[in-house]
Amino acid sequence: MKNEMHLEFSALSQNESFARVTVASFIAQLDPTMDELTEIKTVVSEAVTNAIIHGYEENCEGKVYISVTLEDHVVYMTIRDEGLGITDLEEARQPLFTTKPELERSGMGFTIMENFMDDVSIDSSPEMGTTIRLTKHLSKSKALCN
């Protein structure tokens, strides 16, 4: 059975935790393991933080959009902004690369996403925004023992 959710919120830092918890709550119906749930929450946090800090440069008038589809123990997520976009995607995907070293960011967001998810694709155009598509195949074992 296919199930979908769509979320839109202002690009405010305090909404990052809202997005993370909302996505985790929606995915919980598939009974993921704690590791799987933690990985998904971390990825959502990284993608939303990137949209807010880099996409909109903390301009709270921007919006972040999240779509999640659940189908056959697979989680498909799209996290999108309409912000500044990424001028050099290859460089941005390098570990430790950051455009904002003054904020003491680690530059590991895309690396974390690529390590925790089964598939990651990023589409970005300057002044048009960024769309990140993520796929995670969940184990079919139950998270809790009976």
Swiss-Prot record:
SUPFAM superfamilies: ATPase domain of HSP90 chaperone/DNA topoisomerase II/histidine kinase. The gene is spoIIAB. It catalyses: L-seryl-[protein] + ATP = O-phospho-L-seryl-[protein] + ADP + H(+); L-threonyl-[protein] + ATP = O-phospho-L-threonyl-[protein] + ADP + H(+). Its EC number is 2.7.11.1. It comes from the Bacteria. One of its GO terms (biological process) is sporulation resulting in formation of a cellular spore. This is Anti-sigma F factor. Binds to sigma F and blocks its ability to form an RNA polymerase holoenzyme (E-sigma F). Phosphorylates SpoIIAA on a serine residue. This phosphorylation may enable SpoIIAA to act as an anti-anti-sigma factor that counteracts SpoIIAB and thus releases sigma F from inhibition. GO terms for molecular function: ATP binding; protein serine kinase activity; protein serine/threonine kinase activity; sigma factor antagonist activity. PANTHER family: ANTI-SIGMA-F FACTOR RSBW, ANTI-SIGMA-F FACTOR RSBW-RELATED. HAMAP family: Anti_sigma_F. Gene3D superfamilies: Histidine kinase-like ATPase, C-terminal domain. Belongs to the anti-sigma-factor family. Keywords: ATP-binding, Kinase, Nucleotide-binding, Serine/threonine-protein kinase, Sporulation, Transferase. It comes from Bacillus subtilis (strain 168). The keyword ATP-binding applies. The keyword ATP-binding applies.
